[in-house]
Amino acid sequence: MSLEGVFKEGFVTTSYDSVVNWAKTGSLWPMTFGLACCAVEMMHAGAARYDIDRFGMLFRPSPRQSDLMIVAGTLCNKMGPALRKVYDQMAEPRWVISMGSCANGGGYYHYSYSVVRGCDRIVPVDVYVPGCPPTAEALLYGIIQLQQKIRRTNTIARA
């Protein structure tokens, strides 16, 4: 958060967008949408070694309680409508991280008849995390990239 001025009286001046976006970055609540082996790495990021909680993130089981969806794994054609339905149930503002080669573009199963070639065909994706499977560090880097994107977002224009 960039502060435009700090005065001797203890006042701080900044913009409304800076404060709101700073608060949003520290309270992302992801909803897990684990579809394959990438979900294991996502769970690994929530464990003690990487501790995703230090970013203010709590995994939520319900789409109505979350504002971030992490799509991890191979998305099949039958699962596409369910993904869209869950995404539509999330409250605004909402963000999506596509985790792994299969979620990004079909991955190893790209030419299979039953695989969606990227979850961005179903829901808008904000951050892509590459890898097969991506490491927990890669997911944390993707979360940091999303936080930087949120800080740059114009709050009033998005609403």
Curated annotation (Swiss-Prot):
Transmembrane segments: none annotated. Binds 1 [4Fe-4S] cluster. Keywords: 4Fe-4S, Cell inner membrane, Cell membrane, Iron, Iron-sulfur, Membrane, Metal-binding, NAD, Quinone, Translocase, Transport, Ubiquinone. Its EC number is 7.1.1.-. GO terms for cellular component: plasma membrane; respiratory chain complex I. It catalyses: a quinone + NADH + 5 H(+)(in) = a quinol + NAD(+) + 4 H(+)(out). Pfam families: Oxidored_q6 (PF01058). Its main location: membrane. One of its GO terms (molecular function) is 4 iron, 4 sulfur cluster binding. One of its GO terms (biological process) is aerobic respiration. Gene3D superfamilies: 3.40.50.12280. [4Fe-4S] cluster binds at C37, C38, C102, C132. It is found in: Cell inner membrane. It is a peripheral membrane protein. It is an enzyme of class 7 (translocase). Its cofactor is [4Fe-4S] cluster. It comes from the Bacteria. InterPro entries: NADH_UbQ_OxRdtase-like_20kDa (IPR006137), NADH_UQ_OxRdtase_20Kd_su (IPR006138). Belongs to the complex I 20 kDa subunit family. NDH-1 shuttles electrons from NADH, via FMN and iron-sulfur (Fe-S) centers, to quinones in the respiratory chain. Couples the redox reaction to proton translocation (for every two electrons transferred, four hydrogen ions are translocated across the cytoplasmic membrane), and thus conserves the redox energy in a proton gradient. NDH-1 is composed of 14 different subunits. Subunits NuoB, C, D, E, F, and G constitute the peripheral sector of the complex. This is NADH-quinone oxidoreductase subunit B.
